[in-house]
Amino acid sequence: MRGILVTGALGQIGSELVPALRDHYCVDRVIASDLCVTQAQPETKGPYENLDCTQPHQILEVVRRHDVGTIYHLAALLSATAEKRPLAAWDINLGGLYNVLEAARQHRCQVFFPSTIGAFGPSTPRYQTPQVTIQRPTTMYGVTKVSGELLCDYYAARFGVDSRGLRLPGLISYVAPPGGGTTDYAVEIFYQALRYMHYTCFLGPNTRLDMMYMPDAIRSMVALMEADIATLRHRSAYNVTAMSITPEELAAEIRKHIPKFAIDYQVDPVRQAIADSWPCSVDDSAAREDWGFAPQFNLAGMVTDMLARLGERQRPTKGEIDSSSRGVRWQSTA
């Protein structure tokens, strides 16, 4: 079996994708990579490479040395961070993808590229956004993702690179902390609910966005990469979703488990503007028809599982509760 390289392996998706791939295939053939290692992370317990995707020679060297046949290219700046650092976002998100596709062209690799609901914009139909529609994003993150979709299509048509991708919604994970995305509230809320029974949300209460629980996202990536290419009509950018929710709806579901949980709102105008430019829901019928996409978690199931898995790891001690009530804020050491 040829190697599987995961770039951005220490990020939100990579932290769960790498172990899943190692369980599904072979530990020694899944190579995790990222810019650096800051602590003993599980991703480094198999093959690991320090890799800067903006440096093409580094990618080529890793691909050659490990005989890589598949690349999951996850390295990117997320939406809110990309707005603060637009030039870096262009260099990392698009320049890094170009370097990966070039390595794939030279070494006949399959490539997975994660696109996003951020690839759409305010002129796109907001409800049941079609698979093929207007894509005029108003953020640098979205611009790099639309460009990435087109670049993958180009390399497939021009050079025969087997590139595949998903337009991912907001992802909810209990493994990795939030990473600078507009949908991060849907992760932060669980930590705060368990710690303080209170959360201040940076998006408005009725901001409706598509979401997916990370286990469903991981299964979907692997399923797409294993699918028969002859069935894939939209190979580089399939719409996928599992639920369309608002902060208020998520809080209400959490309240079924933590009745005293309270939420209030301090809207961040930058992130709210980003969210308002995205679809409220997408049509993922093409993914369901072409390769059998079928998420297992709805809102209720996701909330139940998130709270159970964070559980005792996040619950405060009595001393922490007392400190919190006196205005002392708990800080994670993670």
Regions from the language model: what does each represent?
Residues 53-92:
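NAD(P)H-binding glycine-rich loop region in Rossmannoid oxidoreductase-like domains
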